[in-house]
């Protein structure tokens, strides 16, 4: 896939083989700890500290580790944040940066998570910078910076979709109303619906139809969707590359792949 950095969102990979391969192929690893903006309370702080110490000691000799990060889109509680910062400086020989938060403190926020036309990415940083404290003061045409999370809805190929969507549900696709409100349809269970509303599935469906024409069945829609996937991803990368070292520093696509068959946030499917 030509990635040169992989972010382990909330510390989601522990397998030695992953780190061995990253070492071998020169892929940098942004390594989160296990805290998330909506789930930041730690029931047993001492157990958390012991686990964090074990993690750093076990992985610190992997040259692929580039950054340790305390939490996703928030900061750890002060007690844990201070512990992580001091422990990493001590145990990892102060060789690597520790960031409290994945999208603040000099980073450029998060998002968007739905498909946007290429022009959008060239003309505005496209981020909800409200997360940044202090906020980026540069208006909409600056603030690209280092974006650690940006993505889009992404339909897999028909060959994949037919493996997890029952044939009786292939066509027609859910209506806009169903995408917005339905809980129980099979599409929503695979994150094409309200479960992933910030991927804007209605806009994704309408963009495929508007830009590449109405389809007569699922296979045709999936084929056209690949063109939209390419256009949106290409726009993100090219916009950041166009401004590289002139406001932009890099971006990490949310995300590489899903843990479950899905219609959102992937560069290759389950």
Where are these regions (language model features)?
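Active-site-adjacent substrate/metal-binding segments within catalytic domains
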Residues: 1-67, 186-231
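Hydrophobic faces of well-ordered beta-strands that scaffold small-molecule active sites
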Residues: 6-8, 29-32, 98-100, 146-151, ...
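Residues that line or immediately flank small-molecule/substrate-binding pockets and catalytic motifs
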Residues: 10-13, 72, 102, 255
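Flexible loop/turn segments at secondary-structure boundaries
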Residues: 13-16, 37-39, 74-78, 106-108, ...
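Alpha-helical structural signal in soluble globular domains
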Residues: 17, 21-25, 58, 83-91, ...
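Short, glycine/charged-enriched secondary-structure capping and boundary segments
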Residues: 21-23, 44-45, 82-84, 160-162, ...
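Active-site region of glycoside hydrolase catalytic domains
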Residues: 56-179
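Substrate-binding clefts and catalytic carboxylate motifs of secreted carbohydrate-active enzymes
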Residues: 68, 132-270
